[in-house]
A protein has these predicted regions:
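PRPP-associated nucleotide enzymes
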Residues: 1-205
Length: 205
């Protein structure tokens, strides 16, 4: 399961390499009111919400400010979910191993919310896999996931996922949809068989 937008391109590569089922979960940062580049938590497409209480206290955010920012993110998520899931039902994860992928972990809250959301659907195991993660995000995500795999850990005082990529851009919605078309073309026989075979021992990656 990739987290759009950036995580979808990484997840596609992983899914193709492992010949795994490919899908997504929408999880978005809750931006700070006067500093949208920063965040104080995350929300997923099923409403799962995790707040960064340290940031809430640091910026003295009121309940009204929190509610307003969360409602704005949920509105954006609804639109994205309609776009991304229009021809793609959610994957069946109960009793299965789920590999959750993003382009990196900065604060970790976007992934934490996604993990908590999927946990409620009773998977056998949740593995988080990312190319890079900040040293502060890793222990937070390790508390909610069964395993965390990161190729690189960043220990600097300032951490930006984009700094670890030679070529970086935020994929458009069209690019996200194109990833699913590419996976579908390569795995059409597998897609047709999903409804015909038992899913217990088939991993969702």
């Amino acid at each position: 399961l990739g987290i759009p937008n950036g995580g979808i391109l990484v997840a596609l590569g992983v899914a193709l390499a492992l010949e795994a089922e490919f899908n997504l979960i929408v999880s978005r940062k809750i931006p700070l009111p006067l500093s949208p580049e920063g965040g104080f938590g995350a929300v997923t497409d099923d409403g799962t919400t995790i707040l960064n209480e340290d940031m809430v206290k640091r910026f003295n955010l009121s309940p009204q400010q929190i509610t307003y920012q969360v409602s704005r993110v949920r509105s954006d998520i609804r639109q994205r979910s309609l776009l991304y899931h229009r021809d793609r039902p959610p994957s069946r994860v109960k009793g299965r191993t789920v590999l959750m992928v993003d382009d990196g972990l900065a604060s970790g809250y976007t992934m934490m919310a996604a993990v908590e959301s999927i946990r409620g659907r009773q998977p056998r195991e949740i593995i988080v896999a990312v190319p890079v993660a900040s040293a502060t995000a890793l222990p937070k995500v390790e508390k909610v996931a069964d395993r965390v795999i990161s190729c690189v850990a960043g220990f600097g005082p300032e951490f930006y996922v984009s700094d670890f990529y030679r070529y970086w851009h935020e994929p458009s919605d069209d690019e996200v949809l194109q990833c699913f078309k590419e996976w579908g073309l390569r795995h059409r026989p597998n897609i047709e068989m999903l409804g015909k075979i038992p899913q217990k021992d088939t991993d969702t990656r």
